[in-house]
């Protein structure tokens, strides 16, 4: 590393000394050498002697002109071009060269296959030209692209196409103009040869918008679902939020080499092809729903992110937390609200809580950052969305929408802060959110402890609710938060008891604002069964001494699907904790009959939504289970999970087989009822695979060979690998032979290989680095093989001999210089060393020290390693 990366602090924010109002870009494109000409209209806002500091990385400067005159008062510093002696208003012209082909970090302008494309968020524009690369500089962009017509027949950028023409030597040009001022992180350029799916959407005010979806040649038949999802997103945003699209054209381009999931560049979204391409034989139900969600997410950014952007990157959750909330609502309105909520909560409990307990713990609005790319996190996005959801809960839909309208009235066309958003919500609703604001500044997961008491003589039921947030590496002191805590009370017949106090009805969302509070309810005629933290009304851990009877009662009677699922989770948690302790003492699994019977009742319930039944029957992942413990024993957790699966498979064998057969569907449709039945059927298959081996082998093999869709084929393959059935190797080979030329389809196969419970899994993963479908230059391949091994196979990654850690160190050493962003994602499991026993900690620490000693250690890795070793 050349020099130690410097931390940036939120409280150091200063408005820029200069603003750029308009920028005219010309790209003379070539993969090896692209010439960029940037002509900017600049205005000074700071002191008259303030120099103009432009950000730039990996650029070859050709010339600098001010008002058409060659300028000499400039100097290049590391990561910057500093220009002095400037007039108050001026035209700045910079010419520089870049090499897209040499750009393996996939930040700025780079090569994806035969195409050229960009990724500018957060700080990628500085890899294209010298500029004020910060989100509070909003300019109108005009972009002219010149390129070889045969190689790059399509030349795309933001806004509307305003001119085009032919040049000699087989070259052509296109000019684009975006009338909306935007920060440079929203700039995009794509050049290549594509198949195009075209459609139109008529907005509610009657404007016709051209929709264009660009995919690699030969992939057109995998594009229609994405187009359907886009039209659904546009319609939903008009109906639910009153927001209409504002340009004449909306383009999406799918590329194979992409660090993120997708990017909301104004009018020209660039997507990881994983979130665009789907055909029934290549994509699962989950893929279809993920595509719908991500297309929605990027489209919704047009207002929450583009029309109103962030003042600085510390405010990232302003656009991301809000837009994730919007995409969750979109998925819930179009699909099953309960299943969507359950999946959001699985992410929070299994992954985000772990981030809160890690060395990288940060509030949803961080206070200190070294490398901004490291803060595109579950905390900023998913916990950020939970914070928006709490505001929605406290205000209600009507007031929340008034708050949104006020937010746009005040901030459209400008760069705003999280405080601006909360202020708009407060002003529109007259609800005091001053205490609530602590969610933006405090990190960590609050723990809410509930104690209850019933007095049959006074017919009163009392809840005592206390909260504490454990210290995190970034904050020793914690304050009580404003927690909306939703409850329901059930009588012994399973009916909801109306909440009353002093003859008045009480809202079912309790406002918990102090370290400890007591809530008393009158006219409760029996000892009630409480449902607590209904709908996961706040992102907290709940502590309450449940009895098994209470939980099985809620699994049967709760009127809310989420509460039924959550009760099943709590019941399992009791026996996961018990059995991990037993395993550590060398004792066998113990599971009372009534627990198996509670799951049997779900299978036999004819009224239950199959989608909910499937969720209840899906055991928590090993990562979700890990969050039940302070010190994680990955081997014990994996073995308890398998033993639990085998026990339930044996106990419920007849019911599982009956439900499996009853939910067979001959046709495949992406409809929510069909998805629900498939999910339930495949959840049953997963258990059946752990039953009697011969029967399981036949059943799984039959489903794999008869499947007319990827969902069922992959479910069979996945079950074969998880249960280590005799048929697994033959099935895996068949899949490889059929799909080895399709990277996205092979990603599923790589994930199964990497998460296999086989003892020699690491040896297999090492061998697959040489597989014909694998390459270290594609982030999707890296995530599906190396990422899945390190992040989703903890028993193997945390092998006692430290072999998993050494493997990851090798991979990160390569990726550190090749693609620091991807390396930084992969290191996460290694930095959480303090959650493991002393022997593992020692080996993890040694691995981190080895990485810390790399000569050219990237800022991305430096930040995480130094925090982990602190």
Curated annotation (Swiss-Prot):
SUPFAM superfamilies, alphabetically? Leukotriene A4 hydrolase N-terminal domain (SSF63737), Metalloproteases ('zincins'), catalytic domain (SSF55486)
Required cofactor(s):
Zn(2+)
At which residues is there a site annotated Transition state stabilizer? 381
- Gene ablation phenotype (knockout): A quadruple peptidase disruption (pepA, pepB, pepD and pepN) does not grow in M9 minimal medium, does grow better when supplemented with casamino acids.
User: Which enzyme type, at the first EC level?
Assistant: hydrolase
Cofactor comment in the record? Binds 1 zinc ion per subunit.
Binding sites annotated in the UniProt record for Zn(2+) = 297, 301, 320
Looking up Gene3D superfamilies in the UniProt record yields: 2.60.40.1840, 3.30.2010.30, Neutral Protease Domain 2, Peptidase M1, alanyl aminopeptidase, C-terminal domain, tricorn interacting facor f3 domain
Which InterPro entries does its entry note? Aminopeptidase_N-like_N, Aminopeptidase_N-like_N_sf, PepN_Ig-like_sf, Peptidase_M1, Peptidase_M1_dom, Peptidase_M1_pepN, Peptidase_M1_pepN_C, Peptidase_M1_pepN_C_sf
**Record's Pfam families?**
DUF3458, DUF3458_C, Peptidase_M1, Peptidase_M1_N
Q: Which residues form the active site?
A: 298
Q: Which reaction does it catalyse?
A: Release of an N-terminal amino acid, Xaa-|-Yaa- from a peptide, amide or arylamide. Xaa is preferably Ala, but may be most amino acids including Pro (slow action). When a terminal hydrophobic residue is followed by a prolyl residue, the two may be released as an intact Xaa-Pro dipeptide
The UniProt entry's GO CC annotations, sorted and at most eight, read: plasma membrane
Q: Which UniProt keywords apply?
A: Aminopeptidase, Cell inner membrane, Cell membrane, Hydrolase, Membrane, Metal-binding, Metalloprotease, Protease, Zinc
Indicate how the chain sits in the lipid bilayer: Peripheral membrane protein
Major location category of this protein? membrane
| Compartmental location | Cell inner membrane
Claim: Protease is one of the keywords in the record: yes
MF terms from GO for this chain are: alanyl aminopeptidase activity; aminopeptidase activity; identical protein binding; metallopeptidase activity; zinc ion binding
Where along the chain is substrate bound? Answer: 121, 261-265
Q: Does the keyword Transmembrane apply?
A: no
Q: Which family does it belong to?
A: Belongs to the peptidase M1 family.
Q: What does this protein do?
A: Aminopeptidase N is involved in the degradation of intracellular peptides generated by protein breakdown during normal growth as well as in response to nutrient starvation.
Designated name of the protein:
Aminopeptidase N
Give the species this sequence originates from: Escherichia coli (strain K12)
């Amino acid at each position: 590393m050349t020099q130690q990366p410097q931390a940036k602090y939120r409280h150091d924010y200063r408005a820029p000394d200069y603003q750029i109002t308009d920028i005219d870009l010309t790209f003379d494109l070539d993969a090896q050498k692209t010439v960029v000409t940037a002509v900017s209209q600049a205005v000074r806002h700071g002191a008259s002697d303030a120099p103009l500091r432009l950000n730039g990385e990996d650029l070859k400067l050709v010339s600098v002109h001010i008002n058409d005159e060659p300028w000499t008062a400039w100097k290049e510093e590391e990561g910057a071009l500093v220009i002095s002696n400037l007039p108050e208003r001026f035209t700045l012209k910079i010419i520089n060269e870049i090499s897209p082909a040499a750009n393996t970090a996939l930040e700025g302008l780079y090569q994806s296959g035969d195409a050229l494309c960009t990724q500018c968020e957060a700080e990628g524009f500085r890899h294209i030209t010298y500029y004020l690369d910060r989100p509070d500089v909003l300019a109108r962009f005009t972009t002219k692209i010149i390129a070889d017509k045969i190689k790059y027949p399509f030349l795309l950028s933001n806004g509307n196409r305003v001119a085009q023409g032919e040049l000699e030597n087989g070259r052509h040009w296109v000019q684009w103009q975006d009338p909306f001022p935007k920060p440079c992180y929203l700039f995009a350029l794509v050049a290549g040869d594509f198949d195009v799916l075209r459609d139109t959407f008529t907005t509610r005010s009657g404007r016709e918008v051209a929709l264009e979806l660009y995919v690699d040649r030969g992939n057109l038949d995998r594009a229609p679902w994405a187009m359907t999802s886009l039209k659904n997103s546009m319609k939903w945003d008009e109906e639910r939020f009153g927001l209409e699209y504002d340009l004449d054209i909306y383009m999406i381009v799918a590329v194979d080499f992409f660090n993120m999931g997708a990017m909301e560049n104004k009018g020209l979204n660039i997507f990881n092809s994983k979130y665009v391409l789907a055909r029934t034989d290549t994509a699962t139900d989950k893929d279809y729903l993920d595509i719908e969600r991500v297309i929605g997410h990027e489209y919704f950014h047009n207002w929450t992110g583009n029309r109103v952007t962030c003042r600085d990157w510390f405010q990232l959750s302003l656009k991301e937390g809000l837009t994730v909330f919007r995409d969750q609502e979109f998925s819930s309105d179009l699909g099953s609200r309960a299943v969507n909520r359950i999946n959001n909560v699985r992410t929070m409990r299994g992954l985000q809580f772990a981030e809160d307990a890690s060395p990288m713990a940060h509030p949803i609005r961080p206070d200190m950052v070294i490398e901004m790319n490291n803060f595109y996190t579950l905390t900023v996005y998913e916990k950020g969305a939970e914070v928006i959801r709490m505001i929605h809960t406290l205000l209600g839909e009507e007031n929340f929408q008034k708050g949104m309208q006020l937010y746009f009235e005040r901030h459209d066309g400008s760069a705003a802060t999280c405080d601006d958003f909360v202020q708009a919500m407060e002003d529109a609703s007259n609800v005091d959110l001053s205490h609530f604001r602590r969610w933006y500044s405090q990190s960590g997961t609050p723990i809410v402890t509930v104690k209850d008491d019933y007095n049959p003589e006074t017919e009163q039921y009392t809840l005592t609710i206390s909260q504490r947030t454990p210290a995190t590496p970034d904050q020793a002191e914690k304050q009580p938060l404003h927690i909306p805590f939703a409850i329901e009370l059930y009588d012994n017949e399973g009916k909801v008891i109306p909440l009353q106090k002093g003859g008045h009805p009480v809202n079912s969302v309790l406002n918990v604002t102090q370290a400890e509070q007591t809530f008393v309810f009158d006219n409760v005629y029996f000892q009630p069964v409480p449902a607590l933290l209904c709908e996961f009304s706040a992102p907290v851990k709940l502590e309450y001494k449940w009895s098994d009877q209470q939980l099985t009662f809620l699994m049967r009677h709760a009127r809310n699907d989420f509460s039924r699922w959550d009760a099943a989770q709590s019941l399992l948690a009791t026996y996961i904790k018990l059995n991990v302790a037993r395993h550590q003492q060398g004792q066998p699994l113990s599971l009372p009959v009534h627990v198996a019977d509670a799951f049997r009742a779900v299978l036999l319930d004819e009224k239950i939504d199959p989608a909910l039944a499937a969720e209840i029957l899906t055991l928590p992942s090993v990562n979700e289970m890990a969050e039940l413990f302070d010190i994680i024993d990955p081997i014990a957790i994996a073995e308890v999970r398998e033993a639990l699966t085998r026990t339930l498979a044996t106990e419920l064998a007849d019911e599982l087989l009956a439900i499996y057969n009853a939910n067979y569907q001959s046709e495949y449709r992406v409809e929510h009822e069909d998805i629900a039945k498939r999910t339930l059927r495949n959840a049953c298959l997963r258990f059946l695979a752990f039953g009697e081996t011969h029967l399981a082998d036949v059943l799984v093999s039959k489903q794999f060979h008869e499947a007319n869709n990827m969902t069922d084929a992959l479910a069979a393959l996945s079950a074969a690998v998880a249960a280590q059935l005799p048929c697994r190797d033959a099935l895996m080979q068949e899949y490889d032979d059929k799909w080895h030329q399709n990277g996205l389809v092979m990603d599923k196969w790589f994930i199964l290989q990497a998460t296999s419970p086989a003892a020699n899994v690491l040896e297999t993963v090492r061998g697959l680095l040489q597989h014909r479908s694998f390459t270290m230059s594609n982030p999707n391949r890296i995530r599906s093989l190396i990422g899945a091994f390190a992040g989703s196979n903890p028993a193997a990654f945390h092998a006692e001999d430290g072999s998993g850690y050494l493997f990851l160190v090798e991979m990160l050493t390569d990726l550190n210089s090749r693609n620091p962003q991807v390396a930084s994602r992969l290191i996460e499991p290694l930095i959480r060393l303090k959650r493991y026993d002393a022997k593992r900690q020692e080996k993890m620490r040694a691995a981190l020290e080895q990485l810390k000693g790399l000569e050219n250690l990237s800022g991305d890795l430096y930040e995480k390693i130094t925090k982990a070793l602190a």
